[in-house]
Structures are given as C-alpha cells and as structure tokens.
A protein has these predicted regions:
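Catalytic core of PPM/PP2C metal-dependent serine/threonine phosphatase domains
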Residues: 20, 48-115
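N-terminal entry segment of metal-dependent catalytic domains or homologous docking segments
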Residues: 1-53, 106-110, 116, 121
Length: 121
C-alpha cells in the first residue's frame, strides 16, 4: 500500500491532555485508508465518555459503507449528549476519496490544491 502521512492530535480544554470530546481514528485495510473525526458535544469527562464510545464503535465497524457506518454510530450514541462526525475512505489504488459527515464538521485535503469538504444536508 502507498505510504500515507496522517496525524491525530487531541488537546483538552481543561484536565488531562487526552481527556476531551475530540477523537480520530485511522485504519488501513485492503489498499484503502479509513479516517474519521469525532467531536462530542461539550467539554470534559462527559464529552470524553461519548468520544470513547464513538471511537469504539468506529473501530469495530470501519469497513462498513460510510452511510451505514454513520447511521449505526447515530444509533450507538442515542441517549448520550451526542457528537458530530466525519468519515472518509481513500482508495489508495485510484486516489478516489469518499466522504460523509453529520453535523458542523469538515475535513481538509492538502496537496497541490487545498480543498475543504463540508457536510451538507
């Protein structure tokens, strides 16, 4: 598989550096790279708990179709404070990127031309 650089950095508003409602997940499989971002509503321990729940769901279902994945994540987060999410899958052979998101979240592609992908209704 072609080498891909990626980084996930989390910074807490207060408390432990990694105890926040922001998280990301990257998984490589079958010449594809799955990437997801989660931003749980609010701050602190409660937001962190939602982010952990979301990350666990994504880790178990990252090979699913993106639409089905986000619908499943929505169901998995029922009863929590909720989160916004973005997920994409890059086919490393073709360079085709598929993207889906829910809520006020976006991803940015960097290269010869920078492009921002936002979620639309």
């Amino acid at each position: 598989m072609q080498e891909i650089d990626y980084h996930v950095i989390k910074r807490s508003l207060s408390g432990a550096d990694d105890e926040c409602g922001d998280t990301g997940l990257v998984r490589e499989h079958d010449n594809q790279c799955f990437m997801a971002l989660i931003d749980a509503l609010g701050h602190g321990k409660e937001a962190f708990d939602v982010a952990v729940l979301a990350e666990r769901y994504l880790a178990a279902h990252y090979k699913d179709d993106l639409t089905a994945l986000l619908k499943g994540l929505h169901g998995n987060l029922q009863g929590t404070r909720g989160a916004v999410a973005a997920a994409c899958r890059l086919n490393c052979n073709t360079g085709i990127l598929k993207y889906s998101g829910v809520g006020n979240i976006s991803i940015k592609l960097f290269g010869s031309k920078t492009k921002r992908l936002i979620t639309r209704e």
